[in-house]
């Protein structure tokens, strides 16, 4: 594969979202329930963090069970990724009702790779420069594509991509979110911020899974 059609993939991602919106809502029920406890205490946690880091307001203790709520939120986030990756690649029949994701080998493998990728992308923030985060993210795209493989019970394998294709995947997945973030900064409304965050989560998941489908389909055709 030598080229990834950016415009066509963006349009395909939008078409998928609009044509499968009911299923997307259904597979989000369980992840949303897992994330809800943290969402309810988020304003209180933000107040504590602002007091500790920036000296804004009075320093208070963290809410009760916040660590448990953080774990539940992470579980919910991973669950929505797995559900969307399966929905895009394998179809609606491959996703459990209401998007329930139970502990399994698949979930464990997904979590381990997800954790390693998350740590790798955040390393520049602590040791070098935050400006290098996009570069690290770009370099890790072939490994990140295996998250889609694992979600669909496909064995892990090294995915080799030409630099041009890798750049296209990077732009497709992060181009729209970057535009939305810039728009939110200009508007500055809190409600718009949360709507944009939800859109970004779904966009990145759907577009990335579609990129995976295109790459796998082209590689299979070339091997015939």
Model-derived features: positions:
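Interfacial aromatic "cap" segments that immediately flank transmembrane helices
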Residues: 2-34, 98-123, 138-185, 224
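Selective recognition of hydrophobic, aromatic-rich stretches within alpha-helical transmembrane segments
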Residues: 60-92, 122-154, 189-219
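Detector for methionine-enriched segments
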Residues: 1-4, 34, 45-46, 72, ...
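Juxtamembrane "helix-exit" motif on the non-cytosolic side of transmembrane helices
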Residues: 43-53, 122-129, 183-191
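Short, Lys/Arg-enriched, Gly/Pro-containing loop segments at transmembrane-helix junctions
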Residues: 95, 219-224
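Short, small/hydrophobic-residue-rich motifs at membrane-helix boundaries and re-entrant hairpins
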Residues: 23-91, 178
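Charge-dense, low-complexity intrinsically disordered segments
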Residues: 1, 55-59, 198
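A diffuse structural propensity rather than consistent per-protein peaks
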Residues: 5, 60, 94-96
């Amino acid at each position: 594969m030598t080229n990834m059609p950016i415009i066509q993939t963006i349009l395909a991602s939008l078409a998928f979202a609009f044509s499968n919106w009911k299923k997307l809502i259904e597979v989000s029920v369980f992840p949303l329930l897992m994330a809800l406890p943290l969402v309810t205490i988020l304003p209180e946690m933000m107040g504590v963090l602002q007091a500790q880091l920036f000296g804004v307001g009075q320093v208070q203790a963290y809410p009760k069970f916040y660590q448990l709520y953080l774990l539940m939120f992470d579980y919910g986030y991973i669950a929505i990724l797995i559900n969307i990756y399966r929905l895009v690649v394998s179809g609606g029949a491959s996703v459990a009702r209401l998007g329930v994701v139970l502990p399994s080998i698949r979930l464990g493998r997904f979590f381990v790779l997800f954790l390693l990728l998350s740590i790798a992308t955040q390393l520049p923030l602590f040791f070098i420069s935050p400006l290098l985060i996009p570069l690290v993210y770009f370099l890790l795209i072939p490994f990140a594509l295996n998250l889609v493989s694992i979600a669909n019970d496909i064995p892990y394998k090294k995915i080799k991509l030409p630099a041009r294709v890798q750049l296209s995947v990077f732009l497709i997945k992060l181009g729209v979110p970057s535009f939305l973030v810039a728009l939110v900064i200009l508007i500055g409304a809190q409600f718009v911020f949360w709507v944009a965050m939800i859109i970004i989560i779904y966009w990145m998941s759907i577009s990335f899974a579609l990129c995976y489908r295109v790459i796998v389909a082209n590689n299979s055709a070339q091997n015939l």
